[in-house]
A protein has these predicted regions:
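N-terminal (or domain-start) structured segment
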Residues: 37-133, 171, 196-220, 312, ...
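A ligand-binding cleft/hinge motif common to bilobed small-molecule-binding domains
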Residues: 115-125, 191-193, 220-252
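Short loop/turn segments at beta->alpha junctions
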Residues: 18, 90, 157, 202-205, ...
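Conserved helix-loop-beta element of the AMP-binding
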Residues: 45, 135, 161, 234-248, ...
Length: 341
């Protein structure tokens, strides 16, 4: 079986993203950060540029969101946050590089549902331990998938789609950006909750899956909102639902899957992490800076324009969330039969 492909589209923008947000690098304020009367290791973090490893390729949704975050962190801290793309094996190559970096706070990167919650069950062997080899700092964003269907499919709503699938087991196919990606697991969750057979057709990324949806080779896909919503708004495909727990602010007219199938939720998420052993004082300072960045109106607006929700958490909250996600998704992955040896 081939490795899962990176769960990421080359992303058309919903609204212009300013050069300042993407490249920013002006000195900012340190207000709002905890201070103590005695210097501690890392108490002046960051006092040099910070390398941020994005585990997915350039040009996709995660790349744009990561660069927006790093630009805002550069602005707030006065130090450059430099994005380095290290993609491959569904994000595993990049997170392994994070895990093996020096734990001083100056190499951080993107944690994600793919390597940190899906890979531990999907892969027979990993070069890292998702629960032990990282210092998690904060959540970063949550980005639901969008269920879209070919215009020729006789289903204009989720209930109509469910009825069609149940009446025709094995007749229809869904495409995904690869084995073990959130589009794959979204389709598997639909299959299991509806109780019928739907053929899974994995592709090497989201773009070829969308092309085959447009041509009718597959009838439905569920992938990140940025890669699908513009095509749906052009009328070339039909959007039926989002897979997050709430309706998306970028498309509030589209219902959630859970409105029809209670408990249905698959949301891509990002987090900021460094290697295990990063000093607690560095984690605390980074977390405080991250809160300023992720609550800044400019960043909130830019994230939401891309269909993502900014998501600040404490380090303890993101650690607990990651563990719960791995436990929640493991039965779904096993039931799908997906396994990478």
């Amino acid at each position: 079986m081939t490795n899962p492909q990176d769960d990421d589209y080359t992303m058309p923008a919903f609204a212009p993203v300013s050069r300042r947000m993407l490249l920013g690098a002006t000195a900012g304020t340190l207000s709002g950060l905890p201070t103590t009367g005695h210097a501690q290791p890392g108490s002046d973090w960051p006092n040099q540029p910070v390398r941020y490893i994005n585990i997915f390729p350039p040009g996709g949704a995660t790349d744009t969101l990561s660069r927006l975050y790093c630009a805002k962190m550069s602005e707030i801290t006065g130090q450059q946050f430099v994005v380095e793309n290290r993609s491959g094996s569904g994000g595993n190559v990049g997170v392994d590089a994070i895990a093996k970096s020096r734990p001083d706070g100056y190499t951080i990167g993107l944690g994600s549902i793919a390597p940190h919650a899906i890979a531990p069950t999907l892969y027979a062997n990993l070069p890292f331990n998702a629960s032990k080899d990282f210092s998690f700092i904060t959540g970063l964003w949550q980005l639901p998938n969008l269920l879209v269907v070919n215009n020729d499919l006789p289903a204009r709503s989720v209930p109509e789609l469910i009825a069609l699938l149940k009446a025709n087991p094995g007749k229809y196919a869904y495409g995904s950006s690869g084995i073990g990606t959130t589009p794959h697991l979204s389709g598997e969750m639909l299959k299991q909750m509806v109780g019928t057979d739907i053929l899974h057709v994995p592709y090497r990324g989201g773009a070829p899956a969308l092309l085959d949806l447009l041509s009718g080779r597959v009838q439905l896909i569920m992938d990140n909102i940025p890669g699908l919503l513009p095509t749906a708004r052009e009328g070339r495909i039909r959007a039926l639902a989002v897979t997050g727990p709430q309706r998306s602010p970028v498309a509030p007219e589209i219902p959630t899957m859970a409105e029809f199938l209670p408990g249905f939720e698959i949301t891509s998420w990002g987090a900021v992490c460094g290697p295990a052993g990063t000093p607690g004082s560095v984690v605390a300072r980074h977390s405080a800076f991250a809160k300023q960045a992720l609550e800044h109106p400019d960043l909130v607006r830019s994230f939401q324009e891309l269909g993502a929700a900014p998501w600040w958490t404490t380090p303890e909250e993101i650690i607990g969330f990651r563990g719960r996600e791995e436990a929640r998704l493991a039965p779904l992955i096993r039931a799908s039969g997906a396994r990478v040896e």
